């Protein structure tokens, strides 16, 4: 089995730049491609992945620091276990090549443009073998109770955002998420704004108004 490493291309290009694994093969044969298990195509300004079909035994793919906006072109690479896509421009996971990677164990999506945490973790919940995940630096990381919601949903995770997931953390996360999802939780119930006419109330009316607010 072979491991191919290529990167640090200093030439930037704002136009379409394809990530073609064949360009870095020292021996350009189908046999060599079939036996290749790891490819590194980082820092190459890639905007589109092409010609990965013959790399059917690929297990690890590094695509960090590129210009990818979607995860497409890996539909035949179902054996991938490690996929690193940090520092790209990916905004959605739905309809991506990730769908075929049922054995995925490590997924780095840090510093992308992923939004809507509920959609992201619902999508990622299909990966039963996922052990290490990085979503740091995405808009989703700014959402309320970000880490507890991810930890509670993705039961197989051992490392999240470069930090170990402990049993104690899982127990706490479950409680936090339960409260977060409870529509009756005081933390999420918006109190009505005080009416401007309050100052014109009589003393009795003000007392009644305050009692009503305490009940709410």
Regions found by a protein language model. Give the residues of each.
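Long, contiguous C-terminal flanking segments immediately downstream of a protein's structured core
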Residues: 1-62, 67, 75, 79-84, ...
């Amino acid at each position: 089995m072979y491991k191919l490493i290529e990167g640090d291309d200093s030439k930037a290009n704002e136009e379409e730049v394809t990530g073609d694994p064949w360009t870095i093969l020292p021996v350009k044969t189908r046999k060599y491609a079939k036996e290749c298990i790891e490819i590194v195509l980082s820092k190459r300004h890639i905007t589109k992945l092409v010609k990965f079909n013959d790399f059917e035994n690929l297990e690890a793919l590094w695509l960090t620091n590129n210009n990818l906006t979607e995860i497409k072109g890996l539909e035949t690479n179902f054996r991938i276990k490690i996929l690193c896509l940090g520092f790209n421009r990916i905004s959605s996971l739905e309809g991506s090549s990730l769908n075929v990677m049922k054995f995925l164990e490590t997924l780095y999506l840090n510093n992308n443009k992923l939004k809507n945490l509920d959609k992201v973790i619902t999508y990622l919940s299909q990966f039963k073998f996922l052990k290490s995940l990085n979503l740091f630096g995405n808009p989703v990381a700014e959402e309320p109770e970000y880490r507890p919601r991810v930890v509670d949903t993705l039961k197989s995770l051992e490392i999240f955002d470069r930090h170990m997931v402990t049993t104690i953390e899982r127990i706490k996360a479950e409680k936090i998420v339960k409260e977060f999802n409870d529509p009756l939780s005081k933390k999420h119930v918006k109190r009505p704004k005080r009416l401007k006419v309050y100052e014109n109330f009589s003393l009795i009316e003000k007392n009644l108004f305050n009692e009503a607010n305490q009940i709410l």
